[in-house]
């Protein structure tokens, strides 16, 4: 597996039901009814974070997913932690519903809001940088999604259309992502490490593939 030099290769990989993974975190999550449990799903661009987050959310009725890309939209690739903290995580920890519009949404006329409904049992915060050190007081569980860098880039190119503009965006993203993760090292805080490009046979509708050693 091709990875940046500071990131260790995890494994061996094993498939397990998403419900079983959630059960393994029981001691880390708040008691039902107090507030939503908050899970950070972090990983490099194109690693498979969104797919993993969706698998977790499917396993918990009424779970919510917040994508950090929605906070970063027309704001900054990585300098959005205060928006997530103040607009989403602080009210969630107070047991409040969230309907948050980041400043750029108003400035650029984007409709909708970042929503976490009242009574939501689980909030999955998905995105590169979700498990940074500064957000750890608001995260109950951390997942790092690891994928070969070549596979991640190829996946991102397919997702974004493979145009010259998409490639230029990828290069701009990587210019910030590489030093950010070299500093932050979120895999060192991970309760679970998952693979975003599993070669282990599994049912993607119900199972996730995680490192047996983490």
Model-found features: residue ranges?
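Conserved nucleotide-sensing/catalytic segment adjacent to the nucleotide-binding pocket
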Residues: 64-125
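Conserved lysine of the Walker
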Residues: 49
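NTP-dependent small-molecule kinase module
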Residues: 1-32, 137, 158, 182-214
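P-loop (Walker A) phosphate-binding loop of NTP-binding proteins
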Residues: 44
């Amino acid at each position: 597996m091709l990875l940046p030099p500071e990131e260790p290769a995890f494994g061996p990989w094993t498939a397990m039901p998403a419900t079983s993974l959630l059960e393994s975190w029981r001691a880390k999550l708040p008691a039902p009814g107090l507030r939503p449990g908050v899970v950070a799903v972090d990983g490099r661009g194109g690693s498979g974070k969104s797919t993993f987050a969706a698998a977790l959310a499917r396993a918990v009725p009424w779970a919510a997913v917040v994508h950090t890309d929605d906070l970063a939209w027309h704001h900054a690739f990585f300098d959005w932690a205060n928006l997530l903290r103040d607009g989403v995580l602080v009210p969630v920890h107070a047991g409040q519903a969230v309907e948050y519009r980041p400043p750029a949404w108003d400035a650029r006329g984007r409709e909708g809001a970042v929503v976490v409904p009242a009574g939501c049992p689980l909030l999955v915060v998905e995105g590169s940088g979700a498990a940074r050190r500064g957000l750890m007081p608001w995260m109950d569980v951390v997942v790092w999604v690891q994928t070969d860098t070549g596979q991640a880039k190829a996946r991102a190119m397919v997702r974004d259309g493979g145009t010259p503009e998409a490639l230029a965006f990828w290069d701009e993203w990587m210019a910030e992502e590489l030093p950010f993760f070299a500093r932050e090292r979120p895999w060192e805080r991970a309760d679970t490490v998952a693979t975003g490009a599993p070669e282990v046979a599994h049912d993607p509708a119900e199972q996730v593939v995680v490192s047996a050693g983490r």
